[in-house]
Amino acid sequence: MPLNTIPNKGLTSRGYPSDRLVTPIIINGDMSVAQRGTSFSSMSNGQFITDRFFYDRAGLGITAAFTGSQSTDVPTGTSFANSIKMDVTTAQTLGSSGGTYLGVTTKVEGYNYKLISNQKGTISFWVKSNLTGTYSIVFRNNGNDRVLVEEYTIDSANTW
């Protein structure tokens, strides 16, 4: 399931692919609601950046540090007004212990997930980084006993 090769058949005014067949199941995917604030220094595990999206980490020896904010840097040609911006203030050196992850997490509610249960689906998202490379998106259930990891590639730095 290569996430970076979804054909672009145009975008709706909300920035979603125009050929989608169902309503998006990710709540606040446009990052427009940020009731807890819009800028955070020294992000702690579980801290929300915008509503429904939070900094998530697990593993031994995590020394990474981030600031997080609701940003107005968005892809051109969409009607998105906001995005999430994470700035690394202390980089993480990964050891051999495994099981370490750092990222932004959102949870799909059960009633929304039920709309796509046992069906093929597509996830589309915008990403921008000052570093090129291969990254991962992870899907997991609440019990952490079912996990799907898919890779995506950022080929060009500082572009959406």
What is the meaning of each model-derived region?
Residues 2-160:
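Extracellular and organelle-lumenal recognition/adhesion modules and their flexible linkers in secreted
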